[in-house]
């Protein structure tokens, strides 16, 4: 099965969700070192959504730096987004942005820490996803 690459801020919400999955994962560093963080195999990105003015700043800067590396970007196969439904139409917006910019499927979105159902859906979805032609 492929790799999960994720970013989690100090809140650790995304980190806790990924830990519940029990899948192989690599965390994008929270500091400015994201540009030096390299992944050289296929991965699905799990990204939190930050709400800004009109959706600006939805994708964390560390994730942008990571994806600005052409080789990292070349290995992304899909995206999953975390968000907060209180933000209305910007809920999970980071997933839309990454999906469009990287031309990969937006596979799933979940709220905050995710529910047990979200964990099961993502875990089973990843198993199905990686058994197809995404490697």
UniProtKB/Swiss-Prot annotation:
Pfam families, sorted: Flavodoxin_NdrI (PF07972)
GO biological process terms, semicolon-separated: protein modification process
GO molecular-function terms, A-Z: FMN binding
Superkingdom to which the source organism belongs: Bacteria
Known function: Probably involved in ribonucleotide reductase function.
Cited NCBIfam families: nrdI (TIGR00333)
HAMAP family assigned to the protein according to its UniProt record, in alphabetical order: NrdI (MF_00128)
Protein family: Belongs to the NrdI family.
Annotated protein name in UniProt: Protein NrdI
Organism of derivation: Rhizobium johnstonii (strain DSM 114642 / LMG 32736 / 3841) (Rhizobium leguminosarum bv. viciae)
Taxonomic lineage from the root: Bacteria, Pseudomonadati, Pseudomonadota, Alphaproteobacteria, Hyphomicrobiales
